[in-house]
Amino acid sequence: MMAAKFFLHGVPDSPAIWGPLLAALNLGDAPVAVPAMPGFTGPLPAGFAATKEAYADWAVTEVERLAAAYGPVDLVGHDWGAIIVQRVAMIRPDLVRSWALSNAVIDPDYRGHRVARIWNTPLLGEIFMAISGPATLAKSLTDQGVPADIAAE
């Protein structure tokens, strides 16, 4: 059996972003986990801190479940999910067979793209999200080439 796979989406995505890639990969009977990060497809769970470390801890728990059943896991992360995947690989290398990243800039001088800087600004990020709404975010994603059905997710 092929190693288990763990795909982690970015911001403002959902697990739907992986659909076309998974179809193209034709992974057969390989166990595949494509979870939604807490708060991304529904309300943030009560008490969840929504910090990098909280998301990394959550991801470790998810990967531990896969590794317990299938052995070391192949991790794939995009954008914010890539940052979390890297953190999982750093703190729990015993769970990881391989890891691959997309759209993650790891450079101490990189400040993030314009929208990421807005999201990271207290109060401004919340206002931006309240004003933007799902339709505006979906349009932004389709303008960047994401299929409309996935962007609407």
Where do the protein language model's features map onto the residues?
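Exposed regions on extracellular, virion, or secretory-pathway luminal proteins
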Residues: 2-3, 71
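Short beta-strand element of the alpha/beta-hydrolase
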Residues: 3-10
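Flexible "cap/lid" subdomain of the alpha/beta-hydrolase fold that forms the substrate-access gate
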Residues: 11-17, 25, 33, 38-76, ...
